């Protein structure tokens, strides 16, 4: 520094430093506010997601019976799990649900015929959908004289995973819905006049109930749920009957788990009664269409949660994060789909190369 150069007064330096700090603060403040509103919250547990629905999210306002979030989450979890039971266990599923207070327990199954399957395989480029639609339906009497109608769509069946995941390739339709999931949802909706319940000693069809659910003072409430593939069908079915059949959104709520993307990127849904609970470790929600329908509540499991629940599939953070980072780089559903099928051999290779990261049995 030459003698002619003068040092800036200390107070000017202080002002500059404070100005920089203020700018940084404002950037982070507004960025945080923006992403908090636009991007789904990253929750640490389902328990926290319950509190989030109760206290923190103004977008989610569920009416009447649906304000009991604890009950809704517990019921949807139990129903999603029981929907997985094979047909051979229909009777035990019915008994289990009856113990929980449900009535009119039925299993809806729309299996494609052998001819239909043959045509689908012969015409791989045609728009032929061949996945079966499986759903458990039941009713439950609520305090106050209302009747809850539950529809639990079955998720991906490991014995039929190739057919089920083939739905992930289907493009969106003109309305912005995923074609494969929409096909399954419509197949179920078409049978609404065939699904019959006995309520208050009277026969009533699901179609008649849906007609009543257009009213504000309806005595029927509906809970729709599902996991994985069943979650996407549940979302689409709910969105479809809300939009196309004019169901009052105070009469229905949908809670799903591990939900694939089911609509176009630019598809907008102003309702707030479709809630998707997603484990950030799960790869299934990264595939499907381009966007999720409804509100997503993300939670990131703790290591103790992973170790307890993943069991033999558990790997410590270093090994898991390597694969997780790879998943985050996918640019299309096709790539994500291929990565899902590469998961098992990849983990096997990771275990060979990084055995210290894996928990031995």
Regions found by a protein language model. Name each.
Residues 27-34, 65, 83, 101, ...:
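Intrinsic disorder/low-structure terminal segments
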Residues 88, 104-225, 242-253, 268-271, ...:
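A conserved cap/lid and substrate-binding interface adjacent to the catalytic center
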